[in-house]
Regions:
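HhH-family (HhH-GPD) DNA N-glycosylase catalytic core used in base-excision repair
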Residues: 2-313
């Protein structure tokens, strides 16, 4: 058994590689966090955890999913948490090496928004609602993100003008039919064609929207072949410029990129705000305007604290 210790500015990780006779192995990593981050709160923040290929064991409080990295065989990545300042990661698969573990670390950091600095949000919340400030300081206020920007975009497109069960079915079929058990890359989507998205994945009118977005983002080098966003990010206005992406989708994807200045208002959000605040849909953004760049956090975290559920949660 090989024990290797790595150190970096924000984290320490201990890797243990245990091969078996068939070349499979396990790598265990302990990732130390720069600030408290609650895995449970992040998982329960919105409905993403209910979409393939995520798996959440609510008894063991373990989050896992299959990943296909750089065209290799599929690996399973599992995370759990013993304290708010560390995450335990396990990688299971064949030929696990340092390059793979480095990539998995990047994925897990993205899932839990480890690199997001909550200081400004906490400062605003202290003026607006001290409960929200405390929630963020205690490790809440993060929203489960997919392994890539592209996956978050695709899943958001699958929520448009449909019900939650239909969204879950579409995403499940994308994983099974196109991704061979993992979430498909942009190249896999582009290669499968619009007809496959309609017939095999039941995406309906979303099929040309997804094909157009995929080819546009790839050709303009906004995303990599694996779906990672270019350095520098993407703005709300740039998201709106993608044909077929409207204000709701742009707001939701921007939120997952830590732009909390817009509230993705759909029928479910509209219903909640009408019941809670007597607001019409076009009044929601203005009602939370005093939160400035953190409008969405003002809305969503207040709602979480009121013990109301996000759609699909």
């Amino acid at each position: 058994m090989l024990h290797i210790c790595y150190k970096c500015r924000l984290s320490k990780r201990k890797l243990v590689y245990t091969p078996d006779t068939e070349g499979a192995g396990l790598v265990d990593i302990n990732l130390q966090l720069p600030v408290p981050i609650s895995l449970v709160d992040t998982v329960n923040s919105h409905g993403w955890v209910n979409l393939a290929p995520w798996n959440w064991d609510s008894d063991q409080l373990e989050l896992s999913r299959p990943e296909c990295i750089d065209g290799r065989t599929i690996f399973t990545v599992t995370v759990n948490q013993s304290t708010l300042t560390n995450i335990d990661i396990r990688i299971a698969g064949q030929a696990v090496d340092d390059l793979l573990t480095d990539r998995v670390l990047c994925l897990v950091k993205r899932w839990i928004s480890m690199d997001w600095n909550p200081s400004d949000a906490i400062n605003i919340a202290r003026k607006m609602d001290v409960r929200v400030a405390q929630l963020i300081a205690d490790g809440g206020g993060r929203f489960l993100r997919s392994s890539t920007f592209y996956e978050d975009l695709v899943k958001t497109i699958c929520t448009v003008n449909t019900n939650w069960n239909s969204t879950k079915r579409m995403v499940k079929l994308l994983v099974e039919e196109i991704g061979n058990g993992a979430f498909p890359t942009p190249l896999m989507i582009a290669d499968c064609g619009e007809a496959a998205l309609r017939q095999r994945c039941k995406l309906g009118f979303r099929s040309p929207v997804l094909m157009n977005a995929t080819t546009e983002l790839l050709s303009e080098h906004v995303i990599s072949d694996s779906g990672d966003l270019r350095p520098g990010g993407i703005s709300y206005q740039e998201l709106l410029s993608i044909r077929g992406v409207g204000p709701y989708s742009a707001s939701h994807v921007a939120m997952l990129e830590h732009d909390f200045s817009h509230i993705p208002v759909d029928s479910e959000v509209s219903k909640y705000c009408e019941e809670k605040y007597l607001l019409k849909p076009d009044q929601v953004a203005g009602f939370f305007e005093s939160w400035g760049d953190y409008r969405f956090l003002g809305y969503k975290l207040s709602r979480i604290l009121d013990q109301r559920n996000w759609i699909g949660g």
